[in-house]
Amino acid sequence: GLGLDIMTYTRIIEELSRGFMSLAGILNTHKIGATMIARFGTEEQKQRFLPRMCDGSFRAAFSLSEPDAGSDTGALRCRAERDGDEWVVNGTKMWVTNGVRSSLVMLMVRTPDDRITCLLVEKEPGESFEGISVSKKIDKLGYRGLETVEMSYVDHRVPHGNVLGGEEGIGHGRRYALSALELGRINVASRSVGVAQAAFEAAMRYAQQRHTFGRPIFEHQAIQFKLAEMATKLQAARLMTYDAARRADAGERVDMEA
């Protein structure tokens, strides 16, 4: 809510990830939801949701992928049927970040026009709520501070006023989601740079503490070559990330750069 630019956000995420990457992932998903509402929401939706997303009383989840539809958005099967002033949602979503603790889910569904629409699903934090259930908690090899779940919808009703963008937003969910995911990808890159920085610093400390042949291994040229290559790749990744952030701040499309 401070109005900071994307470049500043990128630096913050990088530093957070240097200490604990899961925290940055939680913030990223929340930020994607806020960005979608700020860019494409109606004035009423902005006034209703954004203040609570800024003060922390609402945590957002982003829900696009499905068991048989990861990056293939054209294969979405989760459907919403219009019933008067409500939409009735049925289907299953996969890899939902913040799913359990969220109060708002940015839900991509297929509507009767066979296009994708984004619904703003309000719920109570927890594993079940009025036709919404967490059907599976997904275990991961790492990144375990970030909850990732499968969520099922059975006849869950969403008010028509919660269609992102209002009546004009019907059928435009894919465009809204991909626009916000540009920012999300910059965040992922920032996280990677932060973790790489932490790894490089750990390697430097170890190279100064570990001794062989009576000297720190840092003084062996073979190790110096390895550390120099690490530093070069780290700085290259950082500059590529910053370039994408600066272009986004300038209003450019950055799907390739991100």
Question: Where do the model's predicted regions map?
Answer:
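Internal helix-loop-helix
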Residues: 1-59, 96-104, 248
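A structural signal for short hydrophobic beta-strand segments in well-ordered beta-sheet cores
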Residues: 78-81
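Charged, glycine-rich active-site and insertion segments that engage polyanionic ligands
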Residues: 253-258
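Active-site pocket-lining segment
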Residues: 228-250
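Glycine-rich beta->alpha junctions and the first turn(s) of the following alpha-helix
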Residues: 18, 132-235
